[in-house]
Structures are given as structure tokens and as C-alpha cells.
């Protein structure tokens, strides 16, 4: 065992810090059997109360991801309902609450636990089993106008707008969001003020479009967010960053967005004119969509 002793002075005298570098403990093999406790609900038209149904699953007969186990459960009970699509963490469809944490089932390993609790993501109206109503979430997202707005533009969809590499790098960690709502449904502020607080995902995208050097509607976007609730209900609880399956940092984006809304910071001017290629006769002919 490697032991490193480091001496340092403190206000109350000289202390010693002991550092012990140990190899990580091996994961205990608990066998292939898992007991899945799954939330079941037949829908709002049913008069039955929600229940927890237990499934004994041999995970050695399916893949390693939670979604594989969910598909295995559906083979056992075809009435079990959930959303899925890409199976690669791109579409954001399979968001669930696993062992009390939000995640994407397709990129989350089956826990090394005998009992696995599987619920729909919280603070959403449940339509059936693990399927929730995403209408309110996407209404908030659409309200931030998630697209480039130009005051001076040519024929829509026929020309591309220029952007420097430095300006493009500002959006790294923002445009990777897949709108799975894991962050929003893990946020207590969104639970408490869901009707007016836009939530981490929508605010992350709002910041992404505001700092985009190709967008020309910055002032109106910021004006729309100057509200006591839309952005400033964020209390930096950090659940959004903790539960983001893509490893993004919505709380950081919201903090920077607040500086722009309050006027403490200004949007930087673009390194190049985004429409300069559209004004060039030679380039417009090359960029035109045939």
C-alpha cells in the first residue's frame, strides 16, 4: 500500500495529513437474479389505483442495460408500457426513475442490487406505467423559441450562416441536451413552481440560443425571461447537474443566463458576420439547395 505523508502548518500548530491510496473495492457478484419492483398504472380512464408489481428477472438472459431488462419484463407481461427508441442515449425517450435517481434506461447499467425499483420520472402526470405526459415540459421548451432568429436574412433555408470556431465552442455542453427531462423532473424548484418556472432543460436551451453568434434577437429573448419565476426560481440545488445522463451542467448555464438577464454581462459580438456568405454572389450559388 502506498502511503504518503504530508506535513503542513495550521493555526493551532503542526498537523499531519495521512493519505492512503487503495485500489477500488471489487464489485460483489450477487448472481444473475434481480427482483424488479415496477410501478404499474392502467391510465387515468381506469378506476384502479397504481400498484407495484414484482418481476423476477434473470439478467443473464438479456443485455446489461436497464432498458434490456425492461424489454425482458415486457416479454413476461406484454401490458407493461414504456417509451423507447434509439437505445443509444440520443433520443431521450426512455427516461425513468431508477433506485430514486432519474436516468436514461438505455445507457444505465442494471444495478448490482437484488431489488431494483423502477418508477416513472417524478412530478409528471402518468399516462400508463412508465409513460408520462410531456406536454407541459415541451410547452416550456417551445416558449423559448429554440431556433435562430434573424432580423436580416435571405430566403429561408437556402443559405448557411457563418460562425467562427471560437463562437461555436461556446455552445459545447449546451446543444448536446436530448430533452429527456431527467433534470427538470429532479428539480424541486420545478416541482414547486412548475407552471411558471421553465426548468433546467428549457433554460439551458434558452442560454444556448442567446449566446449563438448567428442569432439576432438577443434583447427580446432576454426581455421574455425578465420575470420573477421563469429563470430566477432556480436556487442552485444542483439536482439537474447530478441527474443529467449526458453529463451536462444546466445549473452553470442558468447562472450565466441570470447574468445576461440582469445586465451584469453582455453578449459578445460575433467574430464574423454570420450573413457575409449570403451576400457573396459566388458563395450563394454554391450554398443554394438544389
Predicted segment positions?
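Glycine-rich phosphate/adenylate-binding loop and adjacent beta-alpha elements
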Residues: 100-119
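N-terminal mitochondrial targeting presequence
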Residues: 1-31
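Ferredoxin-type iron-sulfur electron-transfer modules in oxidoreductases and energy-metabolism complexes
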Residues: 64-78, 119-290
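Short strand-turn-strand beta-turns centered on an Asx-Gly dipeptide
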Residues: 39, 50, 97-101
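Short loop/turn and low-complexity linker motifs enriched in small/turn-promoting residues
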Residues: 40-45
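Active-site phosphate-binding and catalytic loops of NTP-dependent enzymes
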Residues: 21-23, 77-83
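Short, contiguous acidic and Ser/Thr-rich linear segments
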Residues: 51-64
